[in-house]
């Protein structure tokens, strides 16, 4: 999977987390236990994708350096 696809997946996860936050906020309430668990899982997955993106970008930078030397 390329970085564009990874970014798209990460953004989708964050949009889903934001929607859950907005629903709780609009309802004038805290998260339910299920919502909290879901948001925590979404954030973990988004952080994992961010790390994958950073590794992929680092690999691309290394490859570019090899080609320029």
Predicted feature residues:
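Intrinsically disordered, low-complexity terminal tails
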Residues: 1-69
């Amino acid at each position: 999977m390329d970085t564009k696809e990874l970014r798209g997946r990460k953004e989708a996860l964050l949009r889903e987390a934001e929607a859950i936050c907005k629903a709780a906020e609009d309802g004038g309430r805290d998260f339910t236990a299920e919502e909290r668990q879901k948001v925590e899982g979404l954030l973990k997955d988004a952080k994992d994708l961010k790390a994958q993106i950073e590794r992929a970008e680092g690999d691309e930078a290394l490859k570019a350096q090899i080609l320029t030397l």
